[in-house]
Curated annotation (Swiss-Prot):
The gene is SWC3. Component of the SWR1 chromatin remodeling complex. This is SWR1-complex protein 3. Belongs to the SWC3 family. Residues 360-375, 422-431 have a biased composition (Polar residues). The lineage of its organism: Eukaryota, Fungi, Dikarya, Ascomycota, Saccharomycotina. It comes from Candida glabrata (strain ATCC 2001 / BCRC 20586 / JCM 3761 / NBRC 0622 / NRRL Y-65 / CBS 138) (Yeast). Residues 33-43 have a biased composition (Basic residues).
Amino acid sequence: MAVALRARNAVKVEDGIDTSNIIEEVDDNTKGTRSRASRRRRRRGDEEEKHSEEETYNEFNDDGTLKTEGTLQTGNGSGRPFELVAGLPCSLDVPQYNSALTFPLSVRDSGVLYSSLLSSRRTWISGEMFEVYWTRANKVPSLAIKDESIIKELESSKEQDASGKDRMQRMCDCELMAGPHTFSIKLFIVKDDEKEKKWQEEQEYKKKEKEEQKKLESEQRKKRAEEKKQMLQLKKQEREKQMQLQKEARARAKKEQAEARQRQKEEERQRKLMNKERVKEQKASTSKPKKDQNKKNSDQHMIANLNIMAQRDPELKKLMAKVANGQANMQEIEEFKRVIELAKNLPPPGTPPAKPEVQKAQSKPTDSNETSADSSKSEILQESKTNESDKKATAEQATEPKTHSEENKPESENQSRDNSEKSASSHNQEASIKKEADANSVIKKESSDGDGNKSQQPKRKYNKAPKVADELTEKEKEMQLTAFQQKYVTGAELVLEFAENTNFRFLLPKKAIIQYIPESNRYKMSWLQIHNQSDITRFYKRQVKELTRRIHNAEEKQRVTDEYNVFRDKKCPSPLFSSMTVTFSGIHVKFNSIMMNSFDPKEEVRGYMEDVLAVGTRLSGYNLWYQLDGYDDRELAERLRSELNEYEQSLKPKRQKKQ
């Protein structure tokens, strides 16, 4: 039957025959045969008797060709240049229509081409080139069967049908292109118990690993919380310790401040007593009249003004130096006298302007410490200016009487001593006030950091994470495999079902080479169809049993079985094979990994094919006779046309048949 299949697929056109409108010609031919339908039915009995007498014995020769025994009967009872293989005229040689046919019929009237296409399609749908995996149970009414054994057998077959069907899950719908035919098929994935078990173990392992990870994270969170708690406790203790130190520093600062104020009061009291005593001594020691004192003061002011004027005018400074050294002439002396008169008329240096004095007189001091500090500063400034003017006017003071300087000396010493005491007391007071202010600021800062830490800390703002769409895009959804399909990304066992024959499902061969064509999204599958596979399988089992008979170790048995190559055994029957190629189209891209990884590795398949090609025999094809003789082959042509007509009528709906 496989040889006939190859012959039907080997469609050849000889002698310039046009087959472009073959189907239309066959349809016209079948219309012409309707008028002879009644005559055909009358002769059907005779034809069946003739066909029953025909016997054909097909066997394979050593070279793979078909061997026929007996006599082939034809329609006219005489020898013909072709043989009937599966009811179709075939020959090994190329048909010679001009020499073999006396009255050749057209391709349309012969009906061989369309019949061969129909027979080839039926052969593909019956799955003769595939291994049957599942068969639908017979749907026979149980009431019509009285034999209990048959009923039990049907029930068991139904149970097997249900269990086998449950082991297959539909993958996709697609198209299968084989030769000139295109079939609508469904692909299924066969459930594998080992893969399911392995998948379950992996899921349990992942679940266990996830639980351990979750437990570890929980322990780490607890540990971090404990460390944080301890850190907060340490911070709290440190803060309390700091607060205690601050309290002690504050108390110490207050104590020092009180001592400084007490010391300042004591110094103020002592200073007042000393001033009173000094005034008494000054009054007692003063013997000169007040006029001399005023003169002395005016001379001092004049000298101070001269010094200031000399600092501003370099020429005046040179003039003063000449007069002091006795080098000035009369004109320069007269000029110096005018300068002296001018210096006498000027106000004393350091005299504040009138407006600040009025404001100072009108302002009321609020703090005794501030007034004393300001007065001490003004006195120190006045004394420093006076001392400077005294140093610069040493030349003029040399002409003054000595008694006048000696009398003024105690007063200046007492005044400078008083000013130094005032400045020292003011400096001490300012230092104590500054120290107290620093201590208060530190205490306030620490207390705010310690007690009011929670209130002053800014609230933490949590930025909400952008919402991630839970639903995937349409494209990602389409590319998503189901949980079951993800288990069989590699090593899946695929089953196909023809839409024209849903009672059978066939396994795709594992020892095949699959090729993906991305431009057209198609898969091309090629394999070797061994027609005597059953004989080779029986021989393989006998040899493996013989090789492993004395081996008791299971692993060793498995190793020997895997290493044994039946095609390299010289006693192995010679494989009779045909090369097959089909194309799958319409399969979604997401199933690419399943399709490409569901077959044996290419290197292994290539080695298997090389072994078969080395020792096997490729079956030769037949050539169909698309034209028959109008007289010698009229009965054969009539039978083919009538069968085509019946097939065409079966395809029409019932409503059209009635018309």
